[in-house]
């Protein structure tokens, strides 16, 4: 690997960097970026597509969630003006994405979080975004474990509501931090990032 000196953005006053995009600031910087080369898009300015987690400013506060950007070359990026396209959690960043229901089942109201993996699904003819989420514990404890949700889009801007696809369900299970998916030879292959704090 070679680190190119692009000189697009400085870091602590040093312009000799390979930084290609900066976040909006706030409580975080852009994070969890996933890039896809899209040869199907007729617009050369959208050949490279980027999904990332960032905090978007609003009148009252900041909203974390899915942000996207486009590039003709993978180096010079233009952020989409609408952000976030999918909001992380529901409401304020401190509000959990799952609220245990009366039956104490931790599988309601899925939302996205800050680990993202993109793929083009040739079977469904759409983009698929696999992201981390959080589930509450069966006893109601919040942010119990990490799990995986999926959202899809045909235009990379309008995304479906996240759908839970993989979650731990035993106290001794690890946590599911991310999922990279590819389609090959008629099969979907997922490479699961598992966290084990034991």
Regions found by a protein language model. Give the residues of each.
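The feature captures the catalytic groove of carbohydrate-active enzymes
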Residues: 177
